[in-house]
């Protein structure tokens, strides 16, 4: 704080730039992180990057039944949804603390 209770703008700018850099690094790490989703007790597993890209699908041969394709389709959709949920949780865990740091820049009302 400067005299008169005003925030030191150069210090605020430096802090904001530091938080921005940390956020960019965390976003890059998140985009490259991989999570696993599953359905059917692990019969179908999906690996997804934090960017949302599906990089692997593993299907247990026990669930492959040509006369019941719908079940396999449902399991794949469920595994992708589970992986997407895991990405959301990971993003919250990794980016949440940085977003919370934005409020501590010393500006009134933040």
Swiss-Prot record:
Cellular localisation: Cytoplasm, Nucleoid
Cytoplasm found in the keyword field: yes
InterPro entries attached to this UniProt entry: YbaB-like_sf (IPR036894), YbaB/EbfC (IPR004401)
Protein name as annotated: Nucleoid-associated protein Mvan_5528
Keyword Transferase attributed: no
GO molecular function: DNA binding
Major subcellular location class: cytoplasm
Family classification: Belongs to the YbaB/EbfC family.
Record text on subunit structure and interactions: Homodimer.
SUPFAM superfamilies in the record: YbaB-like (SSF82607)
Function statement: Binds to DNA and alters its conformation. May be involved in regulation of gene expression, nucleoid organization and DNA protection.
Keyword entries, A-Z: Cytoplasm, DNA-binding
NCBIfam families, per database record: DNA_YbaB_EbfC
Cellular component annotations (GO), alphabetically ordered: bacterial nucleoid; cytosol
């Amino acid at each position: 704080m400067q005299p008169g209770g005003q925030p030191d703008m150069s210090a605020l700018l430096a802090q904001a730039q530091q938080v921005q850099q940390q956020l960019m690094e965390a976003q890059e790490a998140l985009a490259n992180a991989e999570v696993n989703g599953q359905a059917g007790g692990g019969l179908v597993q999906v690996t997804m990057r934090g960017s949302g890209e599906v990089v692997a699908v593993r299907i247990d041969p026990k669930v492959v039944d040509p006369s019941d394709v719908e079940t396999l389709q449902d399991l794949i959709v469920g595994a992708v949804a589970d992986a997407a949920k895991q990405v959301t949780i990971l993003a919250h865990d990794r980016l949440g603390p940085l977003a919370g740091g934005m409020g501590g820049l010393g500006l009134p009302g933040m």
